[in-house]
């Protein structure tokens, strides 16, 4: 019963968001470059690139585990299987070979690579700081660009802005040259001068393994930092846990606004969020209901 309710609420939410009226003709859904997918039960990531000939799409390896089932956000009939690079290791601060493919089930249609084109550049392609590197996250929903910084194994570092939770796997391309691969996150080093970081993108083919020490040296050279540093590697996936944290922050923000505005906006926010979260992760319904109670108490 809960699964049927989730699908119903999710469909209503998508229809309201897109402004689809009853009886209107709707095109058959396809897997979109830059679109959102759900890996396993609740991990949200972005499609980097579609390969129509092979019937696969690329995304980040840290989005799931081998064999996880994948659905397209808002079009749950489009399903496939998640296969990460066999060389990827799901370890803290490990970033090498962070790519995966989704092998789609028979009959799933793949859309064009409308952001980047179909050219996939090889790891040996020469890039310089003059090359404009861009991305488009499924959550950010905006084209953002920076410049090439460095390369380590099959990972390319650039000055792209940080992504939001859910942007993992987003397409990263070099304008005029082609696609690098999926967006992997941001690698940071902290020192007495502050925190500095570079964004990562990974060519979707197995490359040389490397460790944290090598990545630290790449960052220190780029930022001209000597001395000890602390390294962290961020991965912008969205799960039920961090989606809830983001919603909590939004509710806190709303509570500080004019009371009448809160009463008008809060029900709409909760309705949309409830549909999305229930469709993605039924087990968090009780959490959302708790937020409703808190919001109602604030409005009294």
Q: Where are the model-predicted features located?
A:
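Secretory targeting and sorting signals
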Residues: 1-27
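Intrinsically disordered, low-complexity, compositionally biased regions/tails
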Residues: 12-14, 38-39, 111-115, 231, ...
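Hydrophobic/aromatic ligand-binding patch that stacks against planar heteroaromatic rings
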Residues: 17, 49, 171
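C-terminal region of N-terminal signal peptides and the immediate post-cleavage residues
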Residues: 19-33, 256-262, 280-300
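Active-site region of chymotrypsin-like
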Residues: 30-43, 109-119, 139-224
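Serine endopeptidase catalytic core focused on the charge-relay Asp
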Residues: 41-150, 174-175
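Solvent-exposed, acidic/flexible segments
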Residues: 95, 120-127, 165-166, 266, ...
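C-terminal subregion of chymotrypsin/trypsin-like serine protease catalytic domains
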Residues: 174-281, 287
């Amino acid at each position: 019963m809960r699964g049927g309710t989730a699908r119903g609420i999710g469909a209503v939410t998508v229809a309201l968001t897109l402004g689809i009226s009853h009886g209107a003709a709707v095109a058959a859904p396809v897997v979109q470059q830059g679109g959102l997918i759900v890996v396993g039960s609740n991990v949200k990531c972005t499609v980097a690139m579609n390969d129509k000939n092979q019937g696969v799409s690329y995304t980040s390896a840290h989005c799931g585990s081998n064999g996880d089932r994948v659905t397209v956000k808002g079009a749950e009939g489009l399903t496939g299987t998640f296969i990460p690079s066999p060389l990827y290791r799901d370890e803290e601060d490990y970033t090498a070979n962070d790519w995966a493919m989704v092998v789609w089930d028979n009959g799933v249609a793949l859309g064009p690579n409308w952001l980047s084109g179909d050219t996939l550049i090889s790891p040996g392609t020469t890039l310089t700081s003059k090359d404009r590197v861009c991305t488009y996250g499924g959550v950010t929903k905006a084209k953002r660009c920076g410049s090439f910084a460095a390369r380590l194994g099959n990972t390319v570092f650039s000055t792209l802005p940080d992504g939001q939770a859910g942007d993992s796997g987003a397409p990263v391309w070099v304008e005029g040259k082609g696609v690098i691969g999926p967006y992997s996150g941001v690698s940071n080093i902290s020192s007495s001068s502050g925190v500095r970081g570079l964004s990562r993108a990974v060519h979707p083919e197995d490359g040389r393994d490397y460790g944290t020490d090598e990545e630290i040296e790449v960052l220190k050279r780029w930022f001209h930092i000597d001395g000890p540093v602390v390294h962290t590697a961020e991965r912008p996936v969205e799960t039920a846990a961090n989606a809830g944290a983001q919603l909590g922050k939004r509710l806190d923000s709303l509570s500080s606004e004019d009371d009448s505005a809160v009463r008008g906006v809060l029900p709409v926010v909760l309705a949309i969020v409830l549909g999305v979260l229930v469709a993605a992760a039924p087990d968090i319904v009780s959490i959302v209901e708790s937020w409703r109670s808190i919001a109602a108490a604030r409005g009294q």
